[in-house]
């Protein structure tokens, strides 16, 4: 994005997103791509490849399992790093919506829009919608939703989390999956440190998701870190951070 969005431009982007994918034929997902080769693609930006060293995306891709032909919603997409990874994984006949709220920061909007112009985003579109109503209108056939390191932020924002979780459930097809990652808080802290430490208790997040009808199916331990004392902000530079990753499914 080399320009600032007005609310009208955001509305246009949202409508364009829905028009792009809502009526596309549903493609059958194929075999998983070579995720290591995807990450090594020569047209990925140097910034993203540097970010890979910190974010370690390979085990996440292997755990989540995006495949060509899938339709994916990337919640709290931010500047689009994870959206692009999903878009590359579902290419050439899939679709990815990168969701951000209309009141996201100008810096975040600019980063996402600039990314949309790159080759890796040809199967992606902006989805400018609130967290508690995140999918394009009428969407009920998503194969996957990803929600990375932002659920804790909704605990102090003006977001109805119960409505958000139910909306995600409704947007998935039966058998579709929700893969969610967040920064771990101490037992008993629940949502109380969402704004101060940018963390959330794993059991609290799981309980909220399951209350919407999701079935818990797997946990990934690849981003856990026992050296984290959980008493400092998750954004503390160079500090060890304990992250949990959970996979849920909408029952058939």
What are these regions (language model features)?
Residues 228-252:
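Core SAM-dependent methyltransferase catalytic element
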Residues 69-78:
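Conserved class I S-adenosyl-L-methionine
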Residues 146-150:
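A conserved beta-strand element that flanks and buttresses the S-adenosyl-L-methionine
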Residues 134-145:
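A short acidic, Gly/Pro-enriched loop at the edge of an enzyme's catalytic core
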């Amino acid at each position: 994005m080399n320009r600032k969005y007005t609310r009208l431009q955001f509305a246009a982007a949202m409508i364009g997103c829905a028009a792009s994918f809502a009526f596309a034929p549903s493609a059958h997902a194929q075999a998983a791509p070579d995720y290591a080769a995807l990450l090594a693609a020569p047209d990925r930006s140097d910034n993203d490849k540097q970010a890979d060293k910190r974010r370690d995306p390979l085990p996440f891709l292997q755990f989540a399992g995006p495949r060509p032909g899938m339709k994916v919603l990337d919640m709290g997409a931010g500047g689009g790093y994870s959206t692009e990874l999903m878009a590359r994984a579902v290419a050439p006949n899939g679709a990815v919506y990168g969701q951000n709220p209309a009141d996201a920061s100008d810096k975040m909007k600019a980063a996402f829009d600039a990314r949309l112009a790159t080759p890796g985003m040809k199967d992606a579109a902006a989805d400018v919608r609130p967290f508690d109503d995140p999918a394009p209108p009428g969407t009920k056939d998503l194969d996957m939703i990803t929600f990375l390191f932002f659920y804790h932020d909704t605990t102090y924002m003006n977001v109805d989390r119960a409505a958000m979780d139910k909306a995600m459930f409704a947007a998935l097809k039966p058998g579709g999956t929700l893969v969610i990652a967040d920064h771990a808080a101490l037992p008993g802290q629940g949502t109380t440190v969402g704004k101060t430490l940018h963390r959330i208790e794993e059991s609290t997040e799981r309980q909220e998701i399951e209350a919407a009808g999701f079935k818990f199916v797997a946990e990934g331990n690849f981003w856990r870190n026992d050296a984290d004392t959980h008493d400092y902000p998750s954004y503390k530079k160079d500090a060890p951070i304990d992250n949990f990753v959970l996979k849920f499914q909408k029952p058939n």
